[in-house]
Design a protein with these regions (language model features):
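Walker B catalytic acidic pair
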Residues: 84-86, 112-113
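Short basic (Lys/Arg) and small-residue
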Residues: 132
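Conserved P-loop
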Residues: 1-72, 116-127, 137-140, 161-162, ...
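Conserved RecA-like ASCE ATPase "motif II neighborhood" in helicase/translocase motors
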Residues: 60-82, 91-94
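Short recognition patches in nucleic-acid-associated and regulatory proteins
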Residues: 141-168
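Sensor-1/coupling segment of RecA-like P-loop NTPase cores
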Residues: 101-123
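Conserved ATPase-coupling elements of RecA-like P-loop NTPase cores
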Residues: 86-97, 117-122
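Residue-level preference for the first positions of well-ordered beta-strands
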Residues: 4-6, 32-34, 79-82, 107-109
């Protein structure tokens, strides 16, 4: 039976790289995948899953209005659904992916952040934590050498930012992956 997977981590842990590798593994064996990323993530251009290591792939985009049930429907020959930036999924979209896994035997593997820069769950991540059949924490390290579990937003002077909108797209110039201690110390 297929499952809904949630593979989460702080930023810079290799989530997009892992997604691209999984897609390659399926396709190398002749299986079709559908890959989606959040429309609002434009760090590397819209509609791309991009690894900081270099590989990039054009993919389909989703936003809050995307209906995965209608989009994927009963499309034959799909072996797996892969979602990058899964923290931006809505509760309903996660429910749809869960239904596809259990009622259509179509696995969905979602990659994303668990929490925002204030340590709060994203709505999509909260629903994935509730419904995912299998969860895997991907690891990266803090500057101090400990395991990084938090995403710290920083200003132009590399100082911790504590206020602002939950979603602000940015890469290494705006965010640092840090351990809990460094997150609290700022």
């Amino acid at each position: 039976m297929a499952k809904l997977f949630f593979r989460y981590a702080a930023m810079n842990a290799g989530k997009s790289t892992a997604l691209l590798q999984v897609a390659h593994n399926y396709e190398e064996r002749g299986h079709r995948v559908r890959i989606f990323t959040a429309k609002l993530d434009d760090r590397y251009g819209r509609g791309f899953v991009t690894s900081r290591l270099g590989p990039q792939r054009e993919v389909e985009q989703f936003d809050a209005e995307t209906d995965f049930d209608a989009l994927i429907g009963e499309t034959p020959g799909i072996a797996c659904i892969l979602i990058d930036e899964a923290q931006f999924l809505t509760k309903r979209q996660v429910q749809q992916l869960h239904e596809m896994a259990h009622l259509r035997n179509l696995p969905a593997i979602c990659y994303g952040l668990r929490t925002d820069f204030q340590g709060e769950l994203f709505p999509g991540s909260a629903t994935l934590l509730a419904l995912a059949d299998e969860m895997d924490e991907m690891k990266t390290i803090c500057d101090c050498g400990r395991k990084a579990t938090m995403n710290m937003r920083v200003d132009a002077h590399n100082r911790k930012v504590t206020d602002g909108a939950q979603v602000e797209i940015g890469g290494n110039a705006r965010y640092r992956s840090v351990c809990g201690r460094c997150f609290r110390q700022g």
